[in-house]
Structure formats: C-alpha cells, structure tokens
C-alpha cells in the first residue's frame, strides 16, 4: 500500500475510535448506594423527577453535566431525550412546583466530587474520567 492509502486508513480508524469513545458514558453513584445495576426505565424516572428512590428504597439524588457531548449521549442513550426536551420537561416541573431540577456541573471532576460526597447521588461521566472515588453502575435495558 502507498503511504497515502495508509494515512487515509489510519485517519479513518482514528475517527471511528473517537466516535466510539464519545458514545460511551459511565453511570456513577455514591459508594453507599446499594444497587449495582439499574434499568434505563428506572434511570429515566429518577432523572426526570418521577422517582426519588432506587429499587432498594434508598434515596436517589440525580446530578447532571450542564452540557456537552457526554451530556447529550447520556440523554439520548439512557433517557431517550434531547437536551431541549430535558430542559423543557424540567422547566415545566419547576414552574408548576412539582420538582427541582437536578444539580448540574460544569465539569466531570466536579460532578464526581459531588457524587462521592453526597449519599444517594447518581450521575454520569465519560469513560476517560477517573472513577475511583465513586461506584460504577451498570445500565440494563
């Protein structure tokens, strides 16, 4: 193969790897959370304010990122919502006095610190964020 073809192949593979890694999010929870897996239906109910407890009965405190690719992937893959739909639903809940929007963070490191320090907290980060301070949860369909 010529050098040009190798370069095109390598660039294509790098693009595929970056796209794949951008599609992955890790669900994180406070280490005191007793569950190790959660259904997307329960996750959606918690993040949309319909549930305030995990399946084991313990309190759930959802936290989000303020925006960005990881936030969008989480909303799409786990809640089946766009960022606009998510905001609109929460604005309605807040306006009618039925709920308070989840605390949102500018960075994954700030989200991890909050989750580590807050009993019942659950959130999400990219796969590249260090997660030693928190527990990882498995999402099931």
Sequence positions of predicted segments:
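Positively charged n-region of N-terminal signal peptides that target proteins for export
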Residues: 1-5
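Sec/Tat signal peptide C-region and signal peptidase I cleavage site
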Residues: 16-22
